[in-house]
């Protein structure tokens, strides 16, 4: 086991505080509409330019191990805020720095750290309740666009794109962000259910100009098995041909004689047909087939429940208004399934989301909800260079997380105003002793720090602006972009309540632990041994005689 270096008391706290300040100072320059960029050197490729707090925090490692521990703990604040709400990482870092700095001053003055922490926790709990009371629901497109714009660093085209995407696919819909190929941002919306499986044979294509298969008002056969024998399918094919409608087959696989016969029948015009593999694998495939069955009012033909393909009738087939299939994807538009059945299925999947233990499972289940409930929107980010593309894509993703958080828990006045108002309401909050009261004051003073930092980054005097904002009431605040005072909500400067709440809770949690630290332990740096290689080689000179 390696030898350890141990520091106690003030020595430990001073080192830790230095690390906290190095990381927080690097992150906080990005806060607000006039925040600056940070350039991150990469071991390969060109440097990355970002205004995203958590991206900056993740890059910072300090040489001094005690200072690095302080930096890593603040990095944890940014990461947790990012995981919880997808945004607010810089705010969380600024809050943590303010609480740690003020708290450690109180500890140095002889206060009991445990009571200080209890005071901080008490103030934060009360602040969270006040934030919830201040929160306003965010449901209309205008508010969603404003939240997206603020989170994307005052880029209103991003805000509009996200609002448009949410309007098209609903609040539950899947919205993904991809790198585009042009200079302009684009929004592609896929209405209906899309899954990543294309046609099994190019001979099914009936739209050569687009290389796609389009079926109008088709029947949909869902089979949880491989189909290789055409005899199994003859009764269904004959019934569909009589009905004069096209047929889409979704099965584990269609191969051999069955696929060849379908292709021949399709090319001769006897029955218009296309076949695709079912999406997913194993249990997930069974579940997704059931989703499609619910959407199209069909039945999954499965031997597990005693159904045979030969006995399938038109009543077992699903139906949709239209199906579009290309090389890689299938889209089912306007399935005829009943709304009540679809909502029941969605509720069932939501229950599974709550019980899911892994992020991967949760993500896949949420995708299934979106495909059933709304649709899929893809925002394609346009930029002139790869460096700009990466920076912009990160901003759009942040803005998307922020708007989702806003829809979930509502919005409060932005620009750090909500926390200033909350702190003003808690001035009379008291603990059970003087040290807890100091802890409460530490937390309330820290709540002004985001506003102060936004103002400082805009090149103004933080104390003057903070006092002016405190003199006002309600949503009255300072717009750093235009350097004007006014109603923040009317000016469209909104923060999601969830983002502000998460930033405050995670900052106080980690900062409270740091204030109560009395001892720090780390590995001693290993001494590099002298390079003995050259000296050892000298003895090999005598080998000359062996030649």
From Swiss-Prot:
GO molecular function: ATP binding; ATP-dependent protein folding chaperone; isomerase activity; unfolded protein binding
InterPro entries named among the record's database cross-references: Chaperonin_Cpn60_CS (IPR018370), Cpn60/GroEL (IPR001844), Cpn60/GroEL/TCP-1 (IPR002423), GroEL-like_apical_dom_sf (IPR027409), GROEL-like_equatorial_sf (IPR027413), TCP-1-like_intermed_sf (IPR027410)
Ranges annotated as spanning the membrane: none
Residues at which ATP binds: 30-33, 51, 87-91, 415, 479-481, 495
Enzyme Commission identifier(s): 5.6.1.7
Source species, domain of life: Bacteria
Keyword ATP-binding: yes
Catalytic activity entry: ATP + H2O + a folded polypeptide = ADP + phosphate + an unfolded polypeptide
SUPFAM superfamilies referenced in this protein's UniProt entry, alphabetically: GroEL apical domain-like, GroEL equatorial domain-like, GroEL-intermediate domain like
Localisation per UniProt entry: Cytoplasm
One Gene Ontology CC term in the entry: cytoplasm
Keyword terms, alphabetized: ATP-binding, Chaperone, Cytoplasm, Isomerase, Nucleotide-binding
Enzyme class, first EC level, given as a word: isomerase
GO biological process: protein refolding
Quaternary structure and interacting proteins, as annotated: Forms a cylinder of 14 subunits composed of two heptameric rings stacked back-to-back. Interacts with the co-chaperonin GroES.
Sequence similarity: Belongs to the chaperonin (HSP60) family.
Function recorded in the entry: Together with its co-chaperonin GroES, plays an essential role in assisting protein folding. The GroEL-GroES system forms a nano-cage that allows encapsulation of the non-native substrate proteins and provides a physical environment optimized to promote and accelerate protein folding.
UniProt-listed NCBIfam families: GroEL (TIGR02348), PRK00013.1 (NF000592), PRK12849.1 (NF009487), PRK12850.1 (NF009488), PRK12851.1 (NF009489)
PANTHER family registered for this protein in UniProt: 60 KDA HEAT SHOCK PROTEIN, MITOCHONDRIAL (PTHR45633)
Protein's recorded name: Chaperonin GroEL
Native source species: Edwardsiella ictaluri (strain 93-146)
């Amino acid at each position: 086991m390696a030898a350890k270096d141990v520091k106690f008391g003030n020595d430990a706290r001073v080192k830790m505080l230095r690390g906290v300040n190095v990381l927080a100072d690097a992150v906080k320059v990005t806060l607000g509409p006039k925040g600056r960029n940070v350039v991150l050197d990469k071991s390969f490729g060109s440097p990355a330019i970002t205004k995203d707090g958590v991206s900056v925090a993740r890059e910072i490692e300090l040489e001094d191990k005690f200072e690095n521990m302080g930096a890593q703990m603040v990095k944890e604040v940014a990461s947790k805020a990012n995981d919880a709400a997808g945004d607010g990482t810089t705010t969380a870092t600024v809050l943590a720095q303010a609480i740690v700095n003020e708290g450690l001053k109180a500890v140095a003055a002889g206060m009991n750290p445990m009571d200080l922490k209890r005071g901080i926790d008490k103030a934060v709990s009360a602040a969270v309740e006040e934030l919830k009371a201040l929160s306003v629901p965010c449901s209309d497109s205008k508010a969603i666009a404003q939240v997206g714009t603020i989170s994307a660093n005052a880029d209103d085209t991003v805000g509009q794109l996200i609002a448009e995407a949410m309007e098209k696919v609903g609040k539950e819909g899947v919205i993904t962000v991809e790198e585009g190929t042009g200079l302009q941002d684009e929004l592609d919306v896929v209405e209906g259910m899309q899954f990543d499986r294309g046609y099994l044979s190019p001979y099914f294509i009936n739209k050569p100009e687009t290389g796609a298969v389009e079926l109008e008002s088709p029947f949909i056969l869902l089979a949880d098995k491989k189909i290789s024998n055409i005899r199994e399918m003859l009764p269904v094919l004959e019934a569909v041909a009589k009905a004069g409608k096209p047929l889409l087959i979704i099965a584990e696989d269609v191969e051999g004689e069955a696929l060849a016969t379908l292709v021949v029948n399709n090319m001769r015009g006897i029955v218009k047909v296309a076949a695709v593999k079912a999406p997913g694998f194993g249990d997930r495939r069974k579940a997704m087939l059931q989703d499609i069955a619910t959407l199209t009012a069909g039945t999954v033909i499965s031997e597990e429940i005693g159904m045979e393909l030969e006995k399938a009738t038109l009543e077992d087939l699903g139906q949709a208004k239209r199906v579009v299939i290309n090389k890689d994807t299938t889209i089912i538009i306007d399935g005829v399934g009943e709304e009540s059945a679809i909502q029941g299925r969605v509720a069932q999947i939501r229950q599974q989301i709550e019980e899911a233990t892994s992020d991967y499972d949760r993500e896949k289940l949420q995708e299934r909800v979106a495909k059933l409930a709304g649709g899929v929107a893809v925002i394609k980010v346009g930029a002139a260079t790869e460096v700009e593309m990466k920076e912009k894509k990160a901003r759009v993703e942040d803005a998307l997380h922020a708007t989702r958080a806003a829809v979930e828990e509502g919005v409060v006045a932005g620009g750090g105003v909500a926390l200033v108002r909350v702190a003003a309401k808690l001035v009379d909050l008291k603990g059970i002793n003087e040290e807890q009261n100091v802890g409460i004051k530490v937390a309330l003073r820290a709540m002004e720090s985001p506003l102060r930092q936004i103002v400082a980054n805009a090149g103004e005097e933080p104390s003057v602006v903070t006092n002016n904002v405190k003199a006002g009431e309600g949503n009255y605040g300072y717009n750093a972009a235009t350097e004007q005072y006014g109603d923040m909500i009317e000016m469209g400067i909104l923060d999601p309540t969830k983002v502000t709440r998460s930033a405050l809770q995670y900052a106080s949690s980690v900062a409270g632990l740091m204030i109560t630290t009395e001892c720090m332990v780390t590995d001693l740096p290993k001494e590099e041994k002298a390079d003995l290689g050259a000296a050892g080689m000298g003895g090999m000179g005598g080998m000359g005689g062996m030649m």
